[in-house]
Amino acid sequence: MEDSYKDRTSLMKGAKDIAKEVKKQTVKKVNQAVDRAQDEYTQRSYSRFQDEDDDDDYYPPGETYSGEANDDEGSSEATEGHDEEDEIYEGEYQGIPSTNQGKDSIVSVGQPKGDEYKDRRELESERRADEEELAQQYELIIQECGHGRFQWALFFVLGMALMADGVEVFVVGFVLPSAETDLCIPNSGSGWLGSIVYLGMMVGAFFWGGLADKVGRKQSLLICMSVNGFFAFLSSFVQGYGFFLLCRLLSGFGIGGAIPTVFSYFAEVLAREKRGEHLSWLCMFWMIGGIYASAMAWAIIPHYGWSFSMGSAYQFHSWRVFVIVCALPCVSSVVALTFMPESPRFLLEVGKHDEAWMILKLIHDTNMRARGQPEKVFTVNKIKTPKQIDELIEIESDTGTWYRRCFVRIRTELYGIWLTFMRCFNYPVRENTIKLTIVWFTLSFGYYGLSVWFPDVIKHLQSDEYALLTRNVQKDKYANFSINFTMENQVHTGMEYDNGRFLGVKFKSVTFKDSVFKSCTFDDVTSVNTYFKNCTFIDTLFENTDFEPYKFIDSEFQNCSFLHNKTGCQITFDDDYSAYWIYFVNFLGTLAVLPGNIVSALLMDRIGRLTMLGGSMVLSGISCFFLWFGTSESMMIGMLCLYNGLTISAWNSLDVVTVELYPTDRRATGFGFLNALCKAAAVLGNLIFGSLVSITKAIPILLASTVLVCGGLVGLRLPDTRTQVLM
């Protein structure tokens, strides 16, 4: 009886030991990630698990636990870093726990229900809690990785993409005068070239920003920059105006995704104390793009000797060389971007724990090697990942034909982008989105509107000065003459020309009014801004001229002949003073941004984003009133430089605030929407301010000042993100 009792006691103790060991191992594996997040920065060793286990283990006298005898049989890559006593090496990656762990076990009373039994509201609540925990942990991880070689390498790669965006904004304005003559652009269609690029950038910003939240920052940026580079390069070779417009539209569509994706990408590898300053330094590349475009235009476009032709049908002039050179920053960014990893913050957001861990370890090791500390170990081995909520259904391979599957896939992705965009107006970011919309619209409307108004005013002042130098010839008579020189800036009124020959003459800004031409010959004549108003031509021969019908206004022809008229569009024989002046003014205006960039970068984390945003916009609005005193070209250029220098701080702080206010799952989408709104406001500002150039100064000044001050006051009401972790 006593032996039977001892056997039962020994059996019960053995069963209890086995159950206790199974329970402890399960609890230890489930809670290991939480313990690591709490202890990794205290450098505590995880051998404490074994020590605690040993204190609680019970083995009957004379018996020992032999469950470790076959441990090697269950080893795998996921368990590397464990010794025979199951001690975890510091910094060794343990792999992400299975999402199905514990799901298939028996559900006891009081056990939490599985995801399949929860409604969407519960799942979203759990996801928000996971995201908050991840945000705090990710900030600690980025701080451990440090700021060094990796961030600087990514800084220059993304800077090239941002530089390409700056070039795209300037390139159309620089090539427009030459492209108008080379592509036979009518006056009614010249405005389309500037607007079509902004239209493409507006659509592209929204699309690529949304795609970056779906497929990743790197992939979206690679695709959009490739689209921009390809069509920008192609536009330099097309001959027709329609094809040129299409190429610039698609080029703008591609580059539209650069700004929202670049800032989202770079912000996600920066620690909180570095974010404001280094995002501001990144903004400097946009200015560098403007300087690059201005300098290249100044150096290339006026040099017609760089041109070549292949027959009369294909003309490759210097402005096309300029377009190719402007595509180089985009090509460079695409090549360099292929060597950079995806944003680890995005990967964690979509549940790709292992890939994110490897990239974070790469960042840590790269920075530590650059510091001369290669022995320093990356101590993180578990990172919180938000609960994934399936929204879209994967398309099966047998769903109709290939093009139907492609169409359904595109439609599904677009619908997903739209859903993400609508979530930008949900709690808790709805109020911030509305305020940011107002600030982005007002700043863009005022900045781009006045940016167009300044050059037009300078051009208007130049025209007034040019008109004062006009030579007026009235009621005179010339007979039996021959002219073979250039005639410029003249008005001939009530003149009579009898038996005259115009041989190889270049007419530049010449107008003939109420004049009579008898038995005259125009041979090999070219003209720019030259018109015949209410003139009479009798027995006159026009041979090899570029006189189009629109140059004869209310004129009469009697027994006249037009032979071998020049075909195609003739390159203007301007002395290039105006071209040099335009490039020089843009160069100075862009260079004036440099001090503002430096100041904003140094003070962004000291005085705060909101103070800089509101203060810069209010000061820019006040500076508009100095335009009352701009009565000369030099004074207007000075005002332009002052205005650009003040507004750049507002742009930099607005970029930083926008990135920090949106969570990771909709950061690029929200930024893309606001950037698209920015382009729409720019087009509206160009139209309104451009129509007021020759009317009055009062309306543009008051309109720009009011808009900027109101936007600055709204910007001061945004939340301060200086001490906030990136959600």
UniProtKB/Swiss-Prot annotation:
Annotated Gene Ontology cellular component terms: dopaminergic synapse; synaptic vesicle; synaptic vesicle membrane
Q: Which InterPro entries match?
A: LD_SV2, MFS, MFS_dom, MFS_sugar_transport-like, MFS_trans_sf, Sugar_transporter_CS, SV2
Phosphothreonine PTM sites in chain numbering: 79
Q: Which residues cross the membrane?
A: 155-175, 192-212, 227-247, 249-269, 281-301, 321-341, 438-458, 579-599, 610-630, 637-657, 671-693, 698-716
Q: In which tissues is it expressed?
A: Expressed at high levels in very few brain areas including the striatum, midbrain and hindbrain, and in the olfactory bulb. Expressed at lower levels in cerebrum, hippocampus and cerebellum (at protein level). Mainly expressed in brain; also detected in lung, liver, kidney.
MF (Gene Ontology): transmembrane transporter activity
Point out residues bearing the modification Phosphotyrosine: 466
Listed GO biological process terms: chemical synaptic transmission; neurotransmitter transport; regulation of synaptic vesicle exocytosis
Q: Report the subcellular localization.
A: Cytoplasmic vesicle, Secretory vesicle, Synaptic vesicle membrane
Write out the PTM section of this UniProt entry.
N-glycosylated.
Keywords, ordered alphabetically: Cytoplasmic vesicle, Glycoprotein, Membrane, Neurotransmitter transport, Phosphoprotein, Receptor, Synapse, Transmembrane, Transmembrane helix, Transport
The entry annotates sugar attachment on: 480, 484, 534, 559, 565
Residue ranges for the region (Disordered) are: 22-120
Q: What does this protein do?
A: Plays a role in the control of regulated secretion in neural and endocrine cells, enhancing selectively low-frequency neurotransmission. Positively regulates vesicle fusion by maintaining the readily releasable pool of secretory vesicles.
Instruction: Please give the family membership noted in the entry.
Output: Belongs to the major facilitator superfamily.
SUBUNIT field: Interacts with SYT1 in a calcium-dependent manner. (Microbial infection) Interacts with C.botulinum neurotoxin type A (BoNT/A, botA).
- Protein name, as recorded: Synaptic vesicle glycoprotein 2C
Q: State the gene name recorded for this protein.
A: Sv2c
